[in-house]
């Protein structure tokens, strides 16, 4: 009986050891104390706290490095783990191949090269080079002298700032007119956003600009892969919408005007004219407003609660009459009316309202 009890206890102990090995949290690898310098540490399922100086660290998946107050990290290579730069901490010459570099308020990342992954900034990112991946500037965070190369994306959120940006050919900027300040150069010249006004923005390759209510955008170029979104009460004039560029707007915008492949287009005083929607573009015609001679190209969408005439719904485009869905808020209108529509292998859904003189070609409709 005693022997059986011993065997049970041994088995229980082994089970506990196995469970601990399998499910224990990441072990704390090391602490670099004030005044101490370490070189060439590889972090993989380890955590390093840096109060002193850490040089040539490699952070692999599962690894973490925390740069504490007055700590310094130099020439760190991040290959899938995390580097946190805390208040008064500094990271210099980091290379981000995957994973995250997170700059907290009061921290600084200097001359990071971003090949992939995410550099998230609540503090300061100075002179980063964005070759791939995404640099995200959060509220009250900032970046200066950022270079965005082909395949890279700089995102500046409301209340964030990006100064002296060098947007190279193929680089992308995603932002809003509520950013604190954004300025720099692109292949078309100088651009800026400040006090709710955006000038000369170039949107391409995943870049976008959101023009908020009562804000303005002037002379925006929406090239292939770019998106211009104008909210109700927003204004965008001088828009140059090229092939592959996308516009998302409603007839409640104060004014949206410019050129596309059809020539001049405009939305003003509740009337949309000659608006062509490319792949991914969208138009919402609100009640008591109208759209004239709208073209929906492949994968574009149009929702009409008002009146539209001469609408063309091309292959794989979708038109909805009498119903709109705005961020999950669904509205119906029996007053909606569509006249002289041509459906050319696209799809038109009648939820409410009236259709008059419709021409259907192809298999859909």
Q: What feature does the model see in each segment?
A:
Residues 1-26:
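Bacterial Sec-dependent N-terminal signal peptides
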Residues 27-31, 35:
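Boundary at the C-terminal end of the N-terminal hydrophobic targeting segment
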Residues 34-39, 45-47, 52-57, 63-65, ...:
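The right-handed parallel beta-helix/beta-solenoid scaffold, focusing on the short coil/turn
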